[in-house]
Amino acid sequence: MRTPPRPEGLYPSPTVRYTQFMVETGHIQLLQITYPHTHSRFRMYERAHFAACLLALVLFQRAESCDPRPVLVQVPNTVPAGYFITQVTLNGCTAIPVSFTSSDPDFTVNTDGSIVTLRSLVISTKRFSVLVQDNSGLDWRVEIILSCKNEDSQKSGSVAQKRAKRRWRPLPFSVVENASPPFPKDVEMIASDSSVNYTVHYVISGQGVTEEPIGLFQLDQKTGMVRVTGPVDREKNPEFNFIARAFDQNNREVDQFLPITVMVEDVNDNAPEFTGNRFFTVEERCRAGTRVGQVNATDRDQPKTPHSLIKYILLNATDMFSIDQSTGIITAKSNTLDREAQDKVFVGVEIRDMGGAPNGLFNRGTAVISLTDVNDNPPTFKEKLYKGTIKENLANVLVTRIPVEDKDLVNTPNWKAVYEVTKGNENGNFRMETDPKTNEGLLYVVKGLDFEKTPVMNLEVTARNEAPLVGTDAKWQSVPLQLNVEDVDEGPEFNPNIMYLKVKENLPNGTVIGTYKALDPETKNSNGIKYYKLTDPGNWITVVESTGELKVANTIDRESSLVHNDTYNITIKAVDESKKTGNGVVILQIEDVNDNIPVIQRPDLNMCNRGDAVSSVLVEAVDQDKPPYSTPFIFELGAEQEGKWKLKDITDSSVVLQQVEPMPNGMYTVPITVKDLQGTGKEQIVNVRVCSCQREDSGVGICGARSASVSLGNYGILALVLSGLLLLLLCLFLIFFCTTKRDKLQITDDTGTGGILLKSNTEAPGEEVKDGTLLLIPTADVVDGSFQSAVTESKNVNTAPGRYGQQFFQSGGVYNTTTQEFGTDQYYTSGRYDNKIYGNGTLQKFSNTGTLDTWRTNGCYLDRKLAYFGEQEDGRYADDLLKNYGNEGVGSSAGSVGCCSILGEQESMEFLNTLGPKFRPLADICYTTNKTGK
């Protein structure tokens, strides 16, 4: 094999840095040639016959490469912790080792290559390796073989020891995995030094011989040749450990057993395999270089060799993602990943060993990358202009729905819209909501709109998302909305809706304090509008029905409990001709006048008797007026109290009343004049009780109980005697009254009219009345005053068809006057008066049970009786007698009560038998007169 030619005298010889022998193809690959001064690199490939290449490789390795040999060490059977085993060196190598790593955790390797035990061990045989790495990054593996020392041999002397050392030859055994037939194949020959002096035969046992896999290795007992009988899989058995023994012809073991380790040399017979999860997520619009995930793969071939060196390659989507060829980490290649364009990306990944060489084994798989949503799309309106219609005065109703489109993930904050009326809602007439299902904007009217003021409202609606915009230059969008207000027939409206009036308290009744008018929104005038009060807690104001004028009806008192913060509210109702209504509020701001004087709060006070020391009490006053008609107060002591009492410590509303000199216990009357700031006030009496106090509570004395004896004086005894005499007289009077009481007289009443007519059994013929109509007098004159006060009289006047005027009277006077438009139905029955009134859209019905009808019925009956008996003609009982009949009324259920209607053809007086017990005495008198002719 040759290096590339070079110009003579210009460049030094190139250095071959790396060669590779392809066992499968039988080629040598010269990967790198470096010229020292320029570091130029050339790659050359030469092909030759397999045998020639193999020979060249052996010669090349002999000259240039480093091949550490296995190290055989004999140690005691029991090795303590910290025991030095041996030192690893790279004999014949120019490389400088920088790190050592033991494959057995029971041993550690120091920086100088010395191997030391980490714990106490019992060793018969043991094998492990040390990985050595030089300063250029290349590494070698040194095999360490431990065997137990033979103590007997050590005691026999130096000759025996020297013989034991050369008893077995070094045994660097290895086989290539998956070797091709034919089998068996020779592996290595073993020989014992005893074979020089003895005829020996060899026996092997252990793994691969007498243990699984049984029979893989065979031994020629005479020659010591170890053979392999079949292909070996390194991934299952990277090495085989068995022992060899030497026996003489008498089957005596002539030497110590030899531990044999057969290493299986790896070939690239396993393709890389994917491991772990290949489903990844990353946000759309993420920055370039953002880590997406890592593809993991393994190769069963020998680690840290080209056979297991994996290279990761993306097969597609290379414009969106990139992959680290050595680690398999996938990263975003740009910041333009768009979930709305493609929410999942299926990326093909190839994993190839041999560092990605064309002859490397490979596998392919798919990584699924899901793009998560960010709010990179604002909601957009489907129309450029929206319109809606609503009737005026409607509130809390839906006006219109505004649809939008949003490409972001549904039902996430990136998709959910939030709406706002950004223009035209200065008065707060509207509110916006979002339909959670359709994401539409819902426009509601929360305050009624006025067609007369704004028939058309131009609004602007803006749509946003719950989440802020990310990774986009787009802005929130707005759309105009035209809302047409429809006119409706409205009721009257007060302007202003709340009117404030300043009034002084105690204004005279009838004083006009203002006018509160309502206007028809359509006509802009107040014609035909009537005004009524809805609320007026104190009945202080009256409203003129036709004009809305407000007048004082009762005393306005600022200090009343109905007044709050000097204001008093009245609600007025306006009604137009179509019965539509509107309400307004009048707030009276009552101004204070000096109509109250200061009043002492507690006119009865207790003063503690302190013996020789003077005492005092606090006198407090209040005035319900406000400043300047109240505090500070002026306190003055009555003129006669000089020398007894004095006032001190005067404040705005209190004064201290103090004794001039100590006073004995007792009641004292102290006049004190209290005036407000305007000098208005009067003299008031303070009753001061001087007593021996049990205690004082907040400066107020609590007097003790007074001991007193009760005895009767002369007047008391006299009062008791007089009371006894009066009681005795009362008892005598009651006894007399009970013993002289008259018996009750039972009077029967068959007709039921005796409850009103007076009984009389002493009637006799008297002067007959000529004109019976004299008894037809008004009922109110018949009924006495005591009965009249309990009876309601009705006087009716029919003014026109379909129109009825009526007045109601009571003992207190006229209490109602009405004129009805649709007539009145009334009727009299025995014991009932019914009156139905229809009009003004209301129904009123009055039913009064009274005895007035009974009086009228009996009066009619008596009129006819007296008219008959008042006739003076001799033939007054004749059939052709002219008879007078009174007005029986309307609808009488008793029928005719004419006294003469039951007379027969004869002039007999038998009809009197049917008149009842009330008129039998009169009938008897008349009948007797007729028979006697008197």
Curated annotation (Swiss-Prot):
Database matches in CDD domains: Cadherin_repeat
Tissues in which the protein is found: Expressed at low levels in the brain and heart.
Transmembrane portions of the chain: 717-737
Effects seen without this gene: Morpholino knockdowns show increased embryonic lethality, with embryos that die developing one of two clear phenotypes following developmental arrest at 10 hpf. The first group show severe epiboly arrest with desmosomal cadherins and enveloping layer becoming detached from the external yolk syncytial layer that continued to undergo epiboly. This results in a population of cells at the animal pole which maintain cell division and some gastrulation movements. In the second phenotype the enveloping layer is attached to the yolk but does not progress through epiboly.
Cadherin domain boundaries: 167-274, 274-381, 382-494, 495-600
Biological process according to GO: cell-cell adhesion; convergent extension involved in gastrulation; desmosome assembly; epiboly involved in gastrulation with mouth forming second; heart contraction; heart development; heart morphogenesis; homophilic cell adhesion via plasma membrane adhesion molecules
GO CC aspect terms: desmosome; plasma membrane
Topological domains annotated Extracellular: 167-716
InterPro entries: Cadherin (IPR039808), Cadherin-like_dom (IPR002126), Cadherin-like_sf (IPR015919), Cadherin_CS (IPR020894), Cadherin_pro_dom (IPR014868), Cadherin_Y-type_LIR (IPR000233), Catenin-bd_sf (IPR027397), Desmosomal_cadherin (IPR009122)
Membrane-protein topology: Single-pass type I membrane protein
Gene Ontology molecular functions: calcium ion binding
Keyword Glycoprotein listed: yes
Membrane topology, Cytoplasmic segments: 738-934
Keyword entries, A-Z: Calcium, Cell adhesion, Cell junction, Cell membrane, Glycoprotein, Membrane, Metal-binding, Repeat, Signal, Transmembrane, Transmembrane helix
PROSITE patterns: CADHERIN_1 (PS00232), CADHERIN_2 (PS50268)
One Pfam family linked to the record: Cadherin_pro
Location in the cell: Cell junction, Desmosome; Cell membrane
Glycosylation sites: 197, 296, 316, 509, 565, 569
Function: A component of desmosome cell-cell junctions which are required for positive regulation of cellular adhesion. Involved in the interaction of plaque proteins and intermediate filaments mediating cell-cell adhesion. Involved in the formation and structural organization of desmosome cell-cell junctions during embryonic development. Required for embryogenesis, specifically for progression of epiboly and normal convergence-extension movements during gastrulation. Required for the development of desmosomal-rich midlines in the heart.
Domain notes: Three calcium ions are usually bound at the interface of each cadherin domain and rigidify the connections, imparting a strong curvature to the full-length ectodomain.
Protein name: Desmocollin 2-like protein
